[in-house]
From Swiss-Prot:
Cited HAMAP family: UPF0741
Protein family: Belongs to the UPF0741 family.
The name this protein goes by in its record: UPF0741 protein BCB4264_A5507
Upper taxonomic lineage: Bacteria, Bacillati, Bacillota, Bacilli, Bacillales
Source domain of life: Bacteria
Residue stretches in coiled coil: none
Length: 74
């Protein structure tokens, strides 16, 4: 089973146009779902994505990608 990324297209701190291409670089075979993730509180202040049903958040997109890569390499 491949990895799954879920990102919100409505949260203020998440820019789908820049985040999705970065996620594709992390895992080009992963499933990427874009839509509301009901994670609005943290999504106002931090960039986030759900990685295999687990939330991962960071102050910036670049920091988020580093955390996601670390999570997938475990």
């Amino acid at each position: 089973m491949g990895n799954e990324f879920r990102v919100c297209d409505d949260c203020q701190a998440t820019n789908v146009k820049t985040l999705v291409p970065k996620l594709k670089k992390v895992d080009s075979c992963a499933t990427i779902e874009v839509g509301c993730q009901s994670y609005c509180g943290p999504g106002r202040k931090k960039s986030f994505a759900f990685v295999n049903n687990r939330p991962v958040a960071a102050p910036t997109e670049d920091e988020l990608i580093v955390k996601i890569e670390a999570k997938l390499n475990k």
